[in-house]
Amino acid sequence: MPASPPSGELATEVAGRYAIFFNGQPCGEERWRIASSAEGLIVTGEQEMVPPHPFPNRQAYRAVLTREWRATGLEIQWTVGERRLVATHHADLTTWRARIEYQDHVKEQEGDYPNYCEVEYVTHLFNSFILAKRDFQLGGEHEFPVLRIGPPYMAVTPERMLYRCVELGTWASPLGPLPAKRYVVSLTSRGEDEGYTFWADEHDVVLESYEGLDPSRPWMRLVEYRRGT
């Protein structure tokens, strides 16, 4: 991601919009923003899904990362119809804590968050954060522990994840054709057949992803991208 490249050059703000698809049909969008602050990198966004998606919903999120792309906090407000869930996650050094509030119920979690562990959430920005820490060549792969956060409770599920770089090419983007790499993401407990694939540019921005491994079934597509100075 170009907000804080390894060279140390810092863009004050990066923002974009993803179109979201279900079974090949448009079903919503995600707008996001990354800004630099004294706190670190502040990531904010809103994702909304509408029919024909089978579960129309809206998520608003705010994440905090260090300048080394380590997630240290994530706040989520998830709305489905009249129901609303609030999830608050934060890292305390090598411990990850979560508090889930839904109606009159509260659930808390606590577990290990070692330095080599990653966090995955429903936005493709977290794919970019994972890529930003690694140098992938064609055929290269990296396996690591990951804390997966997502529906139905926005709680944590620990897993092991594998990223593989499987293809080089040129991909259309809001900025024109760009050199890009295609990655396959899978959980080691399930195998690659249950994974998914996406294209990302040289700055690790996800350009387009797919439902599973089939490139004829788009999942999310970057349709707007802008960078501040």
Placement of each model-derived feature along the sequence:
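Surface-exposed beta-loop interaction hotspot
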Residues: 92-149
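Acidic, serine/threonine-rich low-complexity disordered tracts
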Residues: 2-102, 140-229
